[in-house]
Amino acid sequence: MSTWKAVERSIASLLGGERVPITGRIRGSAPDVEHPWMSIEIKHRKGGLPKYILDSLDQAHKSAKQDQLPVAIWHKKGKKYTDSVIMMNLGDFIEHFGV
């Protein structure tokens, strides 16, 4: 099994979902993971995330109090605030939402 398929399968399992095979799927017609309340698209990269994104998540973690969920929000100038992207570590997501 290829690495990206194994990554999709492992993350699907962590979230209580099931990987959707790509066979017969048209891009955008189905998520990578079948889940009751989330549409999950997984991206796996050899190089990882850019440092500025990792730094923002690290800053959120360092400033979070005990019961706070550390998130980083990225807003693109000129876009609506509700179109901003929210990021968090998967482990924090699972712990907070009890998935």
Kindly give the residue locations of the regions a language model identified.
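Catalytic phosphate/metal-binding cores of nucleic-acid and nucleotide-processing enzymes, i.e., regions
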Residues: M1-V99
